[in-house]
Design a protein with these regions (language model features):
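Intrinsically disordered, low-complexity segments enriched in small/polar residues
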Residues: 20-78, 85-124
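Bacterial N-terminal signal peptides
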Residues: 5-15
Length: 124
């Protein structure tokens, strides 16, 4: 029985490998813990002159407080350093982070401090 369990585990690992290979190393989860809805999310290669398209453009709703979204990159994308911009739904104010190494970061958690008025990001 142990031989079959080991064979199944190896089979499952081999079958899962192609799916894992399709993930780009820059894929990450964005978590909104700001207390507010976010209406727009943009990425650009670090220090680019323009932002890429709004990542939320195809969605009907805002990125609500407490929600998380997985951002996927095409496997052919090699750039590791990216800038991130979020825009709040309530007043169109924005926050920007530069030079995020998405090859090393898999989760970005956004928080807002009402006393300081600053949005911060925790990179895991």
């Amino acid at each position: 029985m142990l031989k079959y369990a080991l064979a199944f585990t190896l089979f499952a690992a081999v079958c899962a490998a192609p799916a894992a290979a399709q993930q780009a190393k820059q894929d990450f989860v964005l978590v909104n813990k700001t207390g507010y809805d976010i209406s727009e999310v943009y990425l650009s290669a670090a220090h680019a002159d323009t932002w890429e398209d709004d990542l939320l453009a195809d969605e009907d709703d805002n990125f609500g407080d407490g929600e998380s979204k997985t951002v996927h990159f095409e496997p052919r994308v090699k750039t590791c350093l990216w800038d991130l911009k979020v825009v709040y739904d309530e007043d169109d104010s924005s926050a920007v982070w530069q030079d995020i190494n998405l090859c090393e970061v898999s989760r970005i958690t956004l928080r807002y401090n009402a006393k300081s008025g600053a949005t911060t990001a925790l990179f895991d």
